[in-house]
Every structure is written in C-alpha cells, then in structure tokens.
C-alpha cells in the first residue's frame, strides 16, 4: 500500500497507463489477427491492406514500450514473409 502522496499519485498514474496500454495492445493484436486471417484465406490483397494497418500499430506499440522493438520487428518480418509466400503461389 502506498504511504506517501507521491507514491499514491504514482499508483494512480500506473492505473491510467495500464488501461491505455491494454487498449493499444488489444488493437495491435486485432490488426495482426486480421492479417493472419487474410493469409489463411489466401487473399493476398486483403492481407496487404491489413498489413498496411498492422505494421504502424506494431511499431507504435514498440515505440511506446508496450512491446519490445525486436518483438515488433520480428512480427512484421514474419507477416511480410508469409504474404510474400502467397504471391509466389
């Protein structure tokens, strides 16, 4: 339990940030899921459109320390690679 005024304020700030970060993480996951769904369906055009939305969200999440930057880069790389495989078919 926070005893000092500054600790109580920090607790309130953490609670606010947690809500914002959860929201951003949920949006990011939804964007990635839409890319993965398009890839599973084999729809390259839909996958590219979804990727245009997902990549900035992943990088923004990394920039705001919601996920690690290497994690974001790895996810983007893997999704782009899967979309490229669709083009080869």
UniProtKB/Swiss-Prot annotation:
The protein in question is named: Small ribosomal subunit protein bS20
Quote the cellular component terms of the Gene Ontology held in the record.
cytosol; small ribosomal subunit
GO biological process terms held by the UniProt record: translation
What family is reported?
Belongs to the bacterial ribosomal protein bS20 family.
Determine if Ribonucleoprotein is one of this entry's keywords.
yes
A GO term, aspect molecular function: small ribosomal subunit rRNA binding
- Function text: Binds directly to 16S ribosomal RNA.
The UniProt keywords, alphabetically, are: Ribonucleoprotein, Ribosomal protein, RNA-binding, rRNA-binding
């Amino acid at each position: 339990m926070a005893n000092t005024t500054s600790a109580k304020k920090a607790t309130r700030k953490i609670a606010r940030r947690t809500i914002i970060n959860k929201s951003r993480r949920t949006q990011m996951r939804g964007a990635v899921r839409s890319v993965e769904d398009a890839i599973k369906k084999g729809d390259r055009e839909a996958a590219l459109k979804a990727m245009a939305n997902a990549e900035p969200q992943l990088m923004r999440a990394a920039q705001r320390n919601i996920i690690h930057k290497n994690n974001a880069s790895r996810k983007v790389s893997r999704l782009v690679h899967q979309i490229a495989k669709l083009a080869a078919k």
